[in-house]
UniProtKB/Swiss-Prot annotation:
Oligomer and partners: Homodimer.
Gene3D superfamilies linked to this entry: 3.30.70.260, 3.40.50.1360
GO molecular function, one term: ribose-5-phosphate isomerase activity
Primary gene name: rpiA
Binding site for substrate: 32-35, 85-88, 98-101, 125
Alphabetical list of CDD domains matching this protein: RPI_A
Role noted for this protein: Catalyzes the reversible conversion of ribose-5-phosphate to ribulose 5-phosphate.
Protein name stated in the entry: Ribose-5-phosphate isomerase A
GO terms of biological process kind: D-ribose metabolic process; pentose-phosphate shunt, non-oxidative branch
Length: 225
């Protein structure tokens, strides 16, 4: 299978995973990116079996609406049963790097509201140590230079993502050359820098379930509590 076929396979596996739990009042959290798009397309098959979805980006909201899946504002719902999203990297503890699509802040907010965070990814995203993929950081525009200097002090090499404006009106710095041995600690450190909205480490709230597409099929991975 090529990468797109692996993404389709994990999207189908995620649908199979949640299908027995869907009820008429279930509201799902939906992520952003190519793998999440495959899941949205698969979700259309069962759109009459749940109430609707909260999207982590304008792009995902539009795709859901095209499938006639009702889209709700997060502030209008009390909680989410599942959050389904892809990742740019995952380690064996299901700590993630996300944000290649610049939706990291909204993804993190939606994930925080979900009882179960299901990460769907192909095997190319599996790493022992996070950091080969540059870590995205959403930054208030006027703080860009200051935040970049602080990130250099942490050992990173920040690069301004040209032409990228987030759904929140902010900019993205991609931080290269980080070997992230302590993801929770680094997530906290970066978030404490004045001007940072949030960073793409999902370590304080990691995934609960990883559906990993491989040539041998889709593997279901959970971290023992």
């Amino acid at each position: 299978m090529n990468q797109d076929e692996l993404k389709q396979a994990v999207a189908k596996a995620a649908l199979d995973y949640i299908k027995p739990h869907l009820q008429s009042d279930t509201i799902l959290g939906i992520g952003t990116g190519s793998t999440a798009n495959y899941f949205i397309d698969a979700l259309a098959e069962v759109r009459t079996q749940f109430e609707g979805a909260v999207a982590s980006s304008e792009a995902s909201a539009e795709r859901l609406k095209k499938h006639n899946i009702p889209v709700y504002e997060l502030n209008s719902v009390s909680g989410l049963e599942f959050y389904i999203d892809g990742a740019d990297e995952t380690n064996p503890r299901l700590e993630l790097i996300k944000g290649g699509g610049a939706a990291l802040t909204r993804e993190k907010i939606v994930a925080a509201n979900a009882k179960t965070f299901i990460c769907i990814a192909d095997e190319s995203k599996w790493v022992d140590v996070l950091g080969d993929f540059p870590l995205p950081i959403e930054v208030i525009p006027m703080a860009r230079s200051y935040v970049a200097r602080e990130l250099v002090k942490l050992g990173g090499d920040p690069v301004y993502r040209e032409g990228c404006v987030t759904d929140n009106g902010n900019i993205i710095l991609d931080v290269f050359n980080l070997r992230i041995l302590e993801p929770v600690k680094l997530e906290q450190q970066i978030n404490q820098i004045t001007g940072v909205v949030t960073n793409g480490l999902f370590a304080m709230r990691p995934a609960d379930v990883l559906l990993l597409g491989s040539q041998e099929g889709v593997k279901t991975i959970k971290v023992d509590a």
